[in-house]
């Protein structure tokens, strides 16, 4: 009897890798598995994979030999040099037309390079974003594949089978994103938006707890209620759960109150913020969210500064509150929703700029649909983003779409009230206030940049355009009126 061949091989049996192949096997695919620590292969095949269609492999040679052609090998390993290391080990074992898939959180430029390098060797490469964490990998993640388009037909049946499904019609949260590094780029932007969402929620929590004095029980009920409306999303849902969790050893203490207020980060938010500068897009909310995590890491310095620097104590703001709690709760909800809309608008504007810069053909409406299920930023209004781009594929900014415009208009009063409360009571809300500032800047017909241009011309002779002739010849002025050179050769800002 001929031994069964694997439909796909997976390298890297950490939790994400294990859950992905369990998902694949549950959809009818036979999976060959390999891990550098070979005992991990045996543990998996005899443990979680026992009695299922898995082929355990103790070498890369065995893995490759066990696969149907064209061979599909998926890497679920640490991003960076480790991916390149395994690619180099696989190359002598593969044939032209075989496919290597990187499912880790790789930088999009690495995926772009790998696509080109492997194409020259006859190997098809896919760099794919996989979102949803451990649970998503097992039950259905959002998958964002990019790379060599010739590879897509060979992995599409597997990826769309294992991805999350949404209504109507069980649509898969997986479709081809674009060439080269496009898949990992979209995943990077997804992660940046995730940073923003988490920071916005934490700022809403801070105001509700420290300004209004809500208990954890009240916070749980508030977020659970919010999850039934416009804010219905995965992160709001899990936040409500977090406020309900008590310590096992001390049932009178909530877990959230025992956690050190110093946030970690893996770097994908930083990548997003850096690239926003490269493509010239003000991704202010994501950048502030990254910086907020940086500030949080200075715990000892903050504790010292709290006894030195003047200003209202944000942790004791609730001692002065005497107003209508329900009204402020609604204002915070409005601020959270409006700021969230700004974050997504900035993210999609950035993807448009990147598509132009890197010559990708991105379908923004379809990208929004990829995020409707399985992923960390899934939320109900993603369908509205799809609708906005269906109505106007050339839409410059989601904020100008009628649905977004009307929602932002309805949230104005609460949004501005929350920003005012934060400033007056010393409550740090960098994401809320940066979102509002971006919104006000974007809708301002005439900004203060004319003075910036004048200053640049004064010290650096950088010239400027005239208001009544914006596309005319650059102008330089002798600002002192005393003749001679007024510009510095030292500065170029």
Curated annotation (Swiss-Prot):
Where does it sit, as one GO cellular component term?
A: cytosol
Positions that bind NADP(+): 12-17, 35-37, 77-79, 105
Q: Which GO terms describe its molecular function?
A: NADP binding; phosphogluconate dehydrogenase (decarboxylating) activity
- A single GO BP annotation from the record? D-gluconate metabolic process
According to its UniProt record, in which pathway does this protein act?
A: Carbohydrate degradation; pentose phosphate pathway; D-ribulose 5-phosphate from D-glucose 6-phosphate (oxidative stage): step 3/3
Active site residues of this protein: 187 (proton acceptor), 194 (proton donor)
Per its UniProt record, what Gene3D superfamilies does this chain match? Answer: 6-Phosphogluconate Dehydrogenase, domain 3, N-(1-d-carboxylethyl)-l-norvaline Dehydrogenase, domain 2, NAD(P)-binding Rossmann-like Domain
Keyword annotations of the record: Gluconate utilization, NADP, Oxidoreductase, Pentose shunt
The UniProt subunit note reads as follows: Homodimer.
Q: Which family does it belong to?
A: Belongs to the 6-phosphogluconate dehydrogenase family.
Function per UniProt: Catalyzes the oxidative decarboxylation of 6-phosphogluconate to ribulose 5-phosphate and CO(2), with concomitant reduction of NADP to NADPH.
* Family matches, as NCBIfam families: gnd (TIGR00873), PRK09287.1 (NF006765)
**Annotated protein name in UniProt:** 6-phosphogluconate dehydrogenase, decarboxylating
The organism of origin for this protein: Dictyostelium discoideum (Social amoeba)
Gene name per UniProt: gnd
């Amino acid at each position: 009897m001929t031994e069964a061949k694997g439909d796909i091989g997976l390298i890297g049996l950490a939790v994400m890798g294990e859950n992905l192949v369990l998902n694949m096997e549950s959809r009818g695919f036979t999976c060959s598995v390999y891990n550098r620590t070979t005992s991990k292969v045996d543990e998996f095949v005899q443990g979680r994979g026992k009695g299922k269609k898995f082929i355990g492999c103790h070498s890369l040679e065995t893995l490759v030999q066990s696969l149907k052609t064209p061979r599909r090998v998926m890497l679920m390993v640490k991003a960076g040099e480790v991916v390149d290391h395994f690619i180099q080990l696989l190359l002598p074992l593969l044939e032209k037309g075989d496919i290597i898939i990187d499912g880790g959180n790789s930088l999009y430029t690495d995926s772009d390079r790998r696509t080109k390098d492997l194409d020259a060797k006859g190997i098809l490469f896919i760099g794919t974003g996989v979102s949803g964490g451990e649970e998503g990998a097992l039950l259905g993640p959002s998958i964002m594949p990019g790379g060599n388009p010739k590879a897509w037909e060979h992995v599409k049946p597997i990826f769309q089978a294992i991805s999350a499904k949404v209504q109507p019609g069980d649509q898969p949260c997986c479709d081809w994103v674009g060439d080269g590094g496009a898949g990992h780029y979209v995943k990077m932007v997804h992660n940046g938006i995730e940073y923003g969402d988490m920071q916005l929620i934490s700022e809403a929590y801070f105001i509700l707890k420290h300004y209004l004095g809500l208990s954890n029980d009240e916070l749980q009920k508030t977020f659970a209620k919010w999850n039934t409306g416009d804010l219905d999303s995965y992160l709001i849902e899990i936040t409500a759960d977090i406020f309900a969790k008590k310590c096992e050893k001390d049932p009178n203490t909530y877990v959230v109150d025992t956690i050190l207020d110093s946030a970690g980060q893996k770097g994908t938010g930083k990548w997003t913020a850096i690239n926003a500068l490269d493509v010239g897009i003000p991704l202010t909310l994501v950048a502030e969210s990254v910086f907020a995590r940086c500030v949080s890491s200075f715990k000892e310095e903050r504790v010292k500064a709290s006894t030195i620097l003047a200003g209202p104590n944000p942790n004791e703001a609730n001692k002065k509150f005497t107003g209508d709690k329900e009204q402020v709760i609604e204002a915070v909800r409005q601020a959270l929703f409006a700021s969230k809309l700004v974050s997504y608008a900035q993210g999609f504007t950035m993807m448009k700029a990147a598509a132009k810069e890197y010559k990708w053909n991105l379908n923004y409406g379809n990208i929004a649909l990829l995020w409707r299920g399985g992923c960390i930023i899934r939320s109900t209004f993603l369908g509205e983003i799809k609708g906005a781009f269906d109505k106007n594929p050339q839409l410059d900014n989601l904020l100008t779409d009628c649905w977004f415009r009307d929602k932002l208009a309805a949230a104005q009063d609460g949004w501005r009230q929350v920003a005012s409360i934060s400033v007056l009571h010393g409550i740090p809300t960098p994401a809320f206030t940066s979102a509002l500032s971006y919104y006000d800047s974007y809708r301002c017909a005439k900004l203060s940049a004319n003075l910036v241009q004048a200053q640049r011309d004064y010290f650096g002779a950088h010239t400027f355009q005239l208001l009544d002739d914006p596309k005319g010849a650059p102008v330089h002025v002798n600002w002192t009126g005393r003749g001679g050179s007024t510009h510095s050769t030292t500065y170029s800002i």
